[in-house]
């Protein structure tokens, strides 16, 4: 459900800007791109650097209501956070982004047997590069990778030998 009255604060002091309340931030088109969330975020821009971070509730829980049989609209409460670190100088730059989101398994007390909803877990990493070709043409390229677990309640885990060792502590990966 989308509230009609959205409260947010965006205080700024020198090179720091905060976002508090129901807010949105953008890291890149392939990672975090204007998603509304309830929480907080910071942007720090010292010189040629741009550092951003956020954390909060990405999705509200929608419980099952038998009277209206809302199986299709049920949702787990989803929490997430992320960081973006970028550097740019004279038209050249690089940005690294890391995001994590996970459904809270205990947020739904009743799930009908006919429901297909499962709690998910995801981590996204991205690297964006920016450069100039000549004096008037610039180019930006971004590579983003997502490691989505569609059902964190499965007990059978994937083979750790085929799973990235740097990602496995961060995501509950399964088949």
Please give the residue ranges for each predicted region.
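Signature for the C-terminal beta-barrel architecture of outer-membrane proteins
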Residues: 1-4, 12-19, 23-27, 31-175
């Amino acid at each position: 459900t989308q509230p009609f009255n959205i409260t947010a604060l965006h205080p700024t002091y020198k090179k720091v800007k905060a976002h508090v309340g129901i807010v949105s931030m953008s890291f890149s088109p392939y990672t975090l791109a204007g998603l509304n969330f309830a929480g907080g975020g910071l942007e720090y821009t010292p010189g040629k650097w741009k550092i951003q971070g956020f954390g909060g509730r990405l999705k509200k829980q929608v419980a099952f209501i038998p009277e209206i049989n809302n199986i299709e609209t049920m949702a787990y409460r989803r929490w997430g956070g992320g960081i973006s670190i970028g550097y740019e100088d004279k038209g050249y730059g690089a940005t690294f982004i890391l995001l994590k989101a996970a459904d809270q398994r205990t947020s739904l007390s009743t799930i009908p047997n006919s429901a297909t909803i499962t709690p998910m877990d995801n981590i996204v990493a991205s690297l964006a590069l920016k450069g100039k070709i000549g004096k008037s043409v610039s180019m930006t390229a971004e590579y983003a990778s997502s490691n989505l677990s569609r059902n964190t309640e499965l007990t059978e885990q994937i083979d750790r030998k085929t799973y990235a060792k740097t990602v496995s502590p961060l995501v509950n990966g399964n088949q």
